[in-house]
Structure formats: C-alpha cells, structure tokens
C-alpha cells in the first residue's frame, strides 16, 4: 500500500444514454429500451436499460441479435449533443467537491477528494452528496465506489448498481482484494481469465500467493499488474484532462469478431461518436496531430497504426482500419481502440498515442 492514504471516488452513471432517453420520454421508462443503430443498417447497441439487460442485451451487440434476445426491445437513435450537454452538467457537479477529476467517458470519472474540505473531508459523504446532486438536479442516478486506490474504486462502483454506493476503507483493502474474483479486475478479459484459471488462479489471494517470476513469465505485463493489485497496490494518480496528451476510447468484445464489416460497425456507431464527444467536451480548442487505431487479437498480440492527420475524420479511420487488418493473419479480434494525439499547448513532443500503460 502507498504511504499516503488517498480518497478516490469512481462515479459511473447508470445506463447513461438510455437513462437520459427515459428521463426525457416517460413512455420509455417501463419498457426494454436501447440506444443504437437500426438492424436494417446492421446497427449495434450503444447502451440499454436494465429491463433490456435482463434478456441478455449488451453494449456493442448487433441490433439484430439484441432483437432476437428481446423481441419487444425498443431501439432509438442516439442524441449525442444531448448526452454531451448532460455530461457537462455532471462535470459541474463534480467540480463543487474537487478539481482533481479524470473523465473516462461521458458517463464515468475518477475523483481524488483526498484534499477536499467538503463534509470534513469524508469521501463517503462527498460521494453521497454527488449522487444526491445528480439526482435532484438532473433526475438521473449514479453509482459510486470509494477506495484508497483507483482500481478498487472502479470495482466498488459496480457492486451496488444501479443507484448504489460501496465504500472500501483502507483497513479492508487486502481483505477485499483477496476475495475478489479475477474477472472483476479491470483489464482481465475472457481469454486471459481462462488462462488464469488454467494456472489455478481464481481470486486475488491466489495471485498474491503465486511466485512473481512465474506470473511474469506466463502472463507478461498482465501478470505484473495483477501481482501488484493482489497486494493492494495501485500507484496510478487521478489524471486531470489538462495533463493528457491524447484521448482514446476502446471496447473489448464479449465475443470475438473477425470481419472488417463487424469492426467498422462498432467504430462508426459506437467508438467514433464516443471519441468525438469526449474530444469536443474535454478539449474543444485544441487541435489534433494524429489519428490511430489499436487492435488486440484473440492471442493477445496487439498492433497499432497511427498517422499524422490534422482533423478528426471518420473516413480516415476507415483507411486506418483497412491498413491495420492487413496484420490480422486470420486471427479473431477481441478489442478495438481509437485515439487521437492532441496538439501540445506549448511545444511539440514526440509521444506515442498508445502508451504501454494507458490502454490496459
């Protein structure tokens, strides 16, 4: 554990896009609802409400598949400008309590309230106040996790969803990590989980007791990362947007995909709108230098392509996708990511858009 005990809050809006639609249209509140593309245009689901999730509908699922699982599903097109506006209102609420805010997307953020004087510095009371403000002012619900380290705050925010709060106090960190199923740790996907299980590793305590060198040999960076997390160590700071050199979004598929068309649907209908929204919200005045695509294959090999391009353009990602898939070699795809490198405010620096520790 770090010497300085931090107070980290992870706030995650509940089914954000769908929740905004239900708020603005009462007729949607009691039905299975999804925001996404039309099945006739080979659309994909961006998000869905909890009624739809009961039928197995999930984000990034083809709309046609979602309708097979839930024939009564009502699919509406996204209103990104509205979601951006609501996200800005949420950010304004965050700023009442701390300036150390790391937005992860329109509906999710880390907050470091270690030095906040609100509510006598109680992170639990601050998290409760944030959730209350969001409900009273925006008529939307948020879930939150509080912990001394980032990854546990994120894990905790999912434990009492929807509209819940979960607090991990410093003295409970190791106990929670020991009992935590590895699939609950951010960055552990389906294929990695199978390999971990084959090695006899199921919960944090299994990793903590494992030999570090063997973990590193078998699992590389993932093994090193899991070993640290299993000891309650996560040294990452809450990084504010003004410190960022790039903006990126990515998605790990619940089932691997293989074709260009499948990749392009997800880029066009999910990843690109999210990247555009995040860029315009966080950095409306800063230009970009490069666009890039990252692909992780089923064998966990990863490749990226980034080219100089001075404006965010969907068509340019089409070109990059064509180029990056020449490296596919028949492999299925488990993750897609898009990124742009921002133009520095003071001087140009030669930095990779996909830093080794930024996309895990």
UniProtKB/Swiss-Prot annotation:
It holds the Pfam family IMS. It is found in: Cytoplasm. GO terms for cellular component: cytoplasm. It comes from the Bacteria. It catalyses: DNA(n) + a 2'-deoxyribonucleoside 5'-triphosphate = DNA(n+1) + diphosphate. The keyword tRNA processing does not apply. Its EC number is 2.7.7.7. GO terms for biological process: DNA-templated DNA replication; error-prone translesion synthesis; SOS response. The active site is at residue 108. Its cofactor is Mg(2+). Binds 2 magnesium ions per subunit. Keywords: Cytoplasm, DNA damage, DNA repair, DNA replication, DNA-binding, DNA-directed DNA polymerase, Magnesium, Metal-binding, Mutator protein, Nucleotidyltransferase, Transferase. PROSITE patterns: UMUC. SUPFAM superfamilies: DNA/RNA polymerases, Lesion bypass DNA polymerase (Y-family), little finger domain. Mg(2+) binds at residues 12, 107. GO terms for molecular function: damaged DNA binding; DNA-directed DNA polymerase activity; magnesium ion binding. Monomer. Belongs to the DNA polymerase type-Y family. This is DNA polymerase IV. It comes from Vibrio cholerae serotype O1 (strain ATCC 39315 / El Tor Inaba N16961).
